[in-house]
Amino acid sequence: MTGRLVQYGRHRQRRSYARISEVLELPNLIEIQTSSYQWFLDEGLREMFKEISPIEDFSGNLSLEFIDYSLGEPKYSVEEAKERDVTYAAPLRVKVRLINKETGEVKEQDVFMGDFPLMTETGTFIINGAERVIVSQLVRSPSVYYSDKVDKNGKRGYSATVIPNRGAWLEYETDAKDVVYVRIDRTRKLPVTVLLRALGFSSDQEIIDLLGDNEYLRNTLEKDNTDSTEKALIEIYERLRPGEPPTLENAKSLLASRFFDPKRYDLASVGRYKINKKLHIKNRLFNQRLAETIADPETGEIIAEAGTMIDRRTLNRLLPYLEKGAGLQTYRPTEGVADGQISVQTVKIYAPNDPDNEKVINIIGNGFIAEDVKHITPADIIASISYFFNLLHGVGDTDDIDHLGNRRLRSVGELLQNQFRIGLSRMERVVRERMSIQDANTITPQQLINIRPVIAAIKEFFGSSQLSQFMDQTNPLAELTHKRRLSALGPGGLTRERAGFEVRDVHYSHYGRMCPIETPEGPNIGLINSLSTYAKVNKFGFIETPYRRVDPETGKVTDQIDYLTADEEDNYVVAQANVPLAEDGTFLEENVIARFRGENIVVKRDRVDYMDVSPKQVVSAATACIPFLENDDSNRALMGANMQRQAVPLLQPEAPIVGTGMEYVSAKDSGAAIICKHRGIVERVEAKEIWVRRLIEVDGKEVKGDLDKYRLLKFVRSNQGTCYNQRPIVKKGDIVEKGEILADGPSMDKGELALGRNVLVAFMTWDGYNYEDAIIMSERLVKEDVYTSIHIEEYEAESRDTKLGPEEITRDIPNVGEDALKNLDERGIVRIGAEVKDGDLLVGKVTPKGMTELTAEERLLHAIFGEKAREVRDTSLRVPHGGGGIVLDVKVFNREDGDELPPGVNQLVRVYIVQKRKISEGDKMAGRHGNKGVISRILPEEDMPFLPDGTPIDIMLNPLGVPSRMNIGQVFELHLGMAAKKLGLHIASPVFDGATEEDVWNILEEAGMARDAKTVLYDGRTGEPFDNRVSVGIMYMIKLAHMVDDKLHARSTGPYSLVTQQPLGGKAQFGGQRFGEMEVWALEAYGAAYTLQEILTVKSDDVVGRVKTYEAIVKGENIPEPGVPESFKVLIKELQSLGMDVTILTSDEQEINMENFDDDDDHAPDAIMVDVKPVESEEADEEKNAVTKE
């Protein structure tokens, strides 16, 4: 027997086929959310206040400083916030100090700065009662990027861009004549020497001394028609501010504020880090030949002679002296923008393609700029220009912008910080204005500060940002994946239309950082990704992945873990996780297959620097739940990973017999389960709560401590309308550890993720009913509620104040019989537990109608009988089509009881209806390998094929679905599942390290099955055996959220679009089926003239005709002639609006007046009791030829 037993949680053992021992535990999978938000609360907010503090007025007399801040206690708990439709938030208070410099008076105050949304323990936010997730965004990192391009004559040119976090872009480029240009903030290009002159290097000679003599610089100087700093500054000013009269002062201050003012230009710490890394001299000398002798600046001792080739060893010897300042040159330009001195570090080298040592190149580094200088400096600009000239001579590298070293993540904390910054800067403007207006002696900080812009900015971000998304809560895996999603879209990111193939493609630097498999199909493919299982995000926002270090001295693979970014990984040779190791950790084989910069290479074992931590570090959490992933084609694996997120939680979940070992971790970290916070003993277990008494160690003995109470959620509606239910899995008296699962959430079984059920599957056809991926199913699965799921829908009715008086929620509804009111209580609200069908009343509500003047008799009758029918109309809430079920809960909110309601609303009633949906024909099901299909037939058990022992099959799949799709993993799963079921085992077969073909054969033998795992099957109808033996086994099948009950829809008459008068489309609008252009052609082709006329007129937009037709059908008369379609009138009006004189003539050229056709229109909609809806403009722009019929 291969495989060993592994314990997952308290309740489940699996036989694991993993061969690779994992050194590193999986991290907490939602850490990307929680740690980022924690950083924001601890440091992000403080940074923001520090950035704008102090705010001074224009005279510099008053100064407002932000000293400290604190978050109070949230007003409502998470559950209350969901129930009351409010935001889960805590009040933010800031300590502010106002200093009056004239009088020396200091006022301190605590100012309330709005409620700040808090993150729940599971990494979500509750905004207006709805759970939302902030998705992390992948953006280009601020830095300097160099790229090459080949023009149409085959000449290679270069371009470079300095991209800040915010501020003006600086771009360099060459043209066909070898002149180097610069663009400042996307304006017209200037020769690059103009920018250098503006910095203070005024003469040609100074520029040549600075950058070194070369033909590109000479060409550029020839093209440059300025000859002094003054002219250069004015030239730049004219480009940036065309049409304004240039003065030297203005020009200087403009350039200085564009680039050297930290408020206007911000690289962020990551930009400074990347620029220092790219432009520092040490990274640019590697593998070059020195053209000068480098000496110790302090002692004059020679370290490297001219002509030395700088290899790794020489560079390491040079480093300390370069750090001390060898080759440091200081310039003190006077007239330029740059005040004070500019320090750059210069080393001369020979051009790489010049054996005669004639060409000497200056390499200029940006000196030593501290990490906290967030704006660009003159030294950076000079060094970036120098790098550009070096590139032209073949020194240096261009950048790959799709490399993950050049893309970084903006997680919740940073996105919030940016939003907060916007709010604070708006507030700062208001504070300045108020300082200058109000009396300086009597003013208080509270009066100065207007918190509205800050609150608005935060609200806008959570409410309407593209990155703030309604949480996908279909099942725990969907929740988890949503929190780990990486999106390249959103503000400051890409757009779907502009993104090319390169951005969407899998890149070698994604290894261990972003999943190559899990991404949506469709227009967003490759733009939305998922974080790999072991990946972490570092302080700069770059994704890191863990590797085991190989000790260079002994050649042993150690258990020391280093997290590397994509940039760092490029310097090392990394071996795969499945390389055979000896007991002591050395490589068994002399040659090892490894990766280096995206290439797979074979190297000697002593050249390996690192080794992968685990085979599943490549993929995301959802992909790691697919067993035998290694045997599936990647396209199908993508569908498998995506469809697991659409699995509906079942009534009786069951963990997969063949799993991967990820099920436990995914379920635990998703936030759907209840996790124990402290070690303790279970004192009480109920359906709604679990009590755990803490056990604390005192003097080596365990003593009972505080009591923790855990509330369980019962039958709550999730965001997607599935049922969110938690069940305890511990017993009274159990001793539980911290981090243990106390209660299963939806789609969980004994602490493991359980999205579907293990069913008996045969690969065979049956009367053609499983043609094209259709699925045939046994009735047993319906009878025994195997695939039954619970769905909860929420309906609400509100009574508002109208102009004619308040609406009223009541049982007294006009023209409604007593039998329709049988389920309503005395308030007019449906009772809990009632069974309701389509169209039944849920909440009785009446709205006042406009009063007509009553006669005296009517007034008398009215006074005597209190007849109400006259002045109100029925606007009750009824069950919509397909919404029938059992009333689960009713919540009533009243303004009188102090509930917070929107303005104008007096009472709000929410009714929850629960449906129990059994599986039926038309429902979509899938396996975990992208093998999806729709149920075409549910057969009685007695008709299903059966095994020799009489067991009927549960599901029949088409064998033709396997070969062309190349997802062989499902066949492995089938056989392994059958054997495990017979042996009573659960199995873990981790991705890329699971059971092999040999293992499957061995377990089949152990279970006493045939080696090919096929069985004779008997036809349930005749009892005869089928001709061939069939593959039968246990497969894990899930029911997806695409259910036929949600899609079935029919309409007789219903709402119409206002302009075209055609029926609306779609189930939500109770619309008709579109009879489009091509369908019209089909009828034309068959010459079906009357059908065609009927479809284009009375079934669509002939307003009068459809009313008359309706009346005729009701009265049983003959159907009248159709009239003129509304779209024809619209067309005429459109032509007339273009200024054309369009008239309609009869056959004998008599003019027809269209106005005559409109006589009957006014009462038309009322006649058939149909509401006419205004509709979005798209609806009106439809092709006139195509109509929507009912």
From Swiss-Prot:
Pfam families: RNA_pol_Rpb2_1, RNA_pol_Rpb2_2, RNA_pol_Rpb2_3, RNA_pol_Rpb2_45, RNA_pol_Rpb2_6, RNA_pol_Rpb2_7
Intrachain S-S bonds: none
PROSITE patterns registered for this protein in UniProt: RNA_POL_BETA (PS01166)
Reaction(s) catalysed (UniProt annotation): RNA(n) + a ribonucleoside 5'-triphosphate = RNA(n+1) + diphosphate
Keyword Chaperone annotated: no
Keywords: DNA-directed RNA polymerase, Nucleotidyltransferase, Transcription, Transferase
Gene3D superfamilies for the chain: 2.40.50.100, 2.40.50.150, 3.90.1100.10, DNA-directed RNA polymerase, beta subunit, external 1 domain, DNA-directed RNA polymerase, subunit 2, domain 6, RNA polymerase alpha subunit dimerisation domain, RNA polymerase Rpb2, domain 2
Enzyme class: transferase
A GO molecular function held by the record: ribonucleoside binding
GO annotations of cellular component type: DNA-directed RNA polymerase complex
SUPFAM superfamilies: beta and beta-prime subunits of DNA dependent RNA-polymerase
EC number(s) stated in the UniProt entry for this protein: 2.7.7.6
NCBIfam families the UniProt entry points to: PRK00405.1 (NF001616), rpoB (TIGR02013)
Function: DNA-dependent RNA polymerase catalyzes the transcription of DNA into RNA using the four ribonucleoside triphosphates as substrates.
Similarity comment: Belongs to the RNA polymerase beta chain family.
Protein's UniProt name: DNA-directed RNA polymerase subunit beta
Source organism per UniProt: Geobacillus thermodenitrificans (strain NG80-2)
